[in-house]
């Protein structure tokens, strides 16, 4: 019963549709759709790959989006299809084994879908400091925006999250490779920064501090503020 519930739950409802799937992914999706299963697809970006330059190169953005993110989606759909078959056959062993693949690849899909929305070109407000409610909350919980940035940059590994703990009614900083909700059901992601090497190495090589220093120039605080307003009300 738990496996059937997991299969049917739309945990990635915030992901946008993308019609330009790679050929291999499109074939796999068509096969899965013919069996009546929901297929997750690569979300479109709200900006061009080169729009975040010079902070993040167009080459990195294209590879990160079309290759890394797409791989998570492909493997997630594959795992869900295998889960469907295992449940139909009452294969408990395979059902249990697939949970890690579902969590890892589904989590990668969630994380990257959030990350893209957390970025914006400078010409579209990227880097502009948060105002009003979120700005006040940051000052209250961390002292200042600069102090928050220093705290996140000091961690500098995996995925760095600024989240809202709805139970404690405060902002928190967390480091994890999984979606923030796996660390607590009351945690809502406001801002996620990908600090894995694939997000910066082609451009910044092994100088990760420079990547962390510069990425704040294209952070979409407007989007983070909108999520905060909705979730804190």
Swiss-Prot record:
Source organism per UniProt: Pisum sativum
Functional note: Destroys superoxide anion radicals which are normally produced within the cells and which are toxic to biological systems.
Lineage top rank: taxon: Eukaryota
Name of the protein this chain belongs to: Superoxide dismutase [Mn], mitochondrial
Keywords attached to this entry: Manganese, Metal-binding, Mitochondrion, Oxidoreductase, Transit peptide
PANTHER family named among the record's database cross-references: SUPEROXIDE DISMUTASE 2, SUPEROXIDE DISMUTASE [MN], MITOCHONDRIAL
Pfam families registered for this protein in UniProt: Sod_Fe_C, Sod_Fe_N
Gene Ontology annotations for the cellular component aspect, listed alphabetically: mitochondrial matrix
Reactions listed under catalytic activity: 2 superoxide + 2 H(+) = H2O2 + O2
């Amino acid at each position: 019963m738990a496996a059937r519930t997991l299969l049917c739950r739309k945990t990635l409802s915030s992901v946008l549709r993308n019609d330009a799937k790679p050929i291999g992914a499109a074939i796999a999706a068509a096969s899965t759709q013919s069996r009546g299963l929901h297929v997750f697809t690569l979300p479109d970006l709200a900006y061009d790959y080169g729009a975040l330059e010079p902070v993040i190169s167009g080459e990195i953005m294209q590879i990160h989006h079309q290759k890394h993110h797409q791989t998570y989606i492909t493997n997630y759909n594959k795992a869900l299809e295998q889960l469907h078959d295992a449940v139909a056959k009452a294969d408990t062993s395979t059902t249990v084994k697939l949970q890690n693949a579902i969590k890892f690849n589904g989590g990668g899909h969630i994380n990257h879908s959030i990350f893209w929305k957390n970025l914006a070109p400078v010409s579209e407000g990227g880097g502009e400091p948060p105002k009003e409610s979120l700005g006040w909350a940051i000052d209250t919980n961390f002292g200042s925006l600069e102090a928050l940035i220093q705290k996140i940059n000091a961690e500098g590994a995996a995925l760095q999250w600024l989240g809202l703990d709805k139970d404690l009614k405060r902002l928190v900083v967390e480091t994890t490779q999984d979606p923030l909700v796996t660390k607590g059901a009351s945690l809502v992601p406001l801002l996620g920064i990908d600090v894995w090497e694939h997000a910066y190495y082609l451009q910044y090589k092994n100088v990760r501090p420079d990547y962390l220093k510069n990425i704040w120039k294209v952070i979409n605080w407007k989007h983070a503020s909108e999520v905060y307003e909705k979730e804190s009300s």
